[in-house]
Amino acid sequence: MPALLVESLMRVRHPAMVPITDIATRETPLRVALRSWFVVVGFWWSATGAIFALERSAATRTLGLVLASALALWGGALVVLERDRDTPSGARRAFLGAAFLWSWVQVAFYGAWIVGPEARMVPVPAEAPGWGLAVRAVASMLWYQLTMLAVMGWAWRVTTARVNRMAWWTLTLFWLVHQVASVNIFLGVENPGRGFFPEPLAYLESYFGPVRNSWLLPASIAVLLTWTIGAVVQALRGPTPYRRQAMMLLSVIGVLSVAELAILGAPLTVPLWEAFLAIRGY
């Protein structure tokens, strides 16, 4: 991961100093899979943990926003720089750029910088999930939802008709699985993860559904699992090294998404970010 970050930074600041080379003949399915797993899981675990830890105080939230904004600018530059490079490394760097942009949105949300209309950021009385409650839930974090769509729209615009659309695919998949998880929590799951929201966002727990799994959870897992298997097949049989690398990265996101939904449906605690939560004082 550090080597990938350093090379990506060199490409942004001094593109002429970094030769455009991809030794496709040395790529094997196992190597592509391991590299993809390392990049996606490493970023997912460390970025999520950092977001939790930075909610410790107003000062750390501000620091988190500054750092995330700087990385988002770098991420945007990577998306633009790599959009004409249909190589495995181009796919990885475009993924990294999209991940930085997505992380900026999440940091802004969890730091309560971009959430929704202030009048809506209050707990609501308990009631069964329904359309009215769903509309209020979306309205309570409207700016956050619109910001995600705006970032996706920008990625779509700058990668349209380009050979490397990995950033757009990544952001779209992030958004889709995020919405699927949110709707499942709204309808009800065994393990919604109460207590993870920082104090300014604690009101969102009033929109959590009953502590039981709804019909949507197994259906969501089945659909995501089917898509992930298809993505793995494309990653193994893709016509080009770029396509194989891109689909392998997306398939790892799919695997993590299936695992996340399974954890939501299981009455257990998985200590993935205990150290980060301890820093926050959770």
Model-derived features: where do they sit?
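C-terminal transmembrane-bundle signature of multipass membrane proteins
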Residues: 210-282
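Interfacial segments of alpha-helical transmembrane regions
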Residues: 91-95, 160-174, 243-255
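Transmembrane alpha-helix boundary signature
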Residues: 83, 107-121
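Short aromatic-rich membrane-water interface segments that cap or initiate transmembrane helices
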Residues: 126-141, 202-215
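Short, hydrophobic transmembrane alpha-helix segments
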Residues: 49-62, 80-85
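Hydrophobic, aromatic-enriched interface-forming segments
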Residues: 138-196
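Central hydrophobic cores of alpha-helical transmembrane segments in multi-pass inner-membrane proteins
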Residues: 44-48, 68-82
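Membrane-interfacial catalytic/cofactor-binding modules of polytopic membrane enzymes
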Residues: 189-221
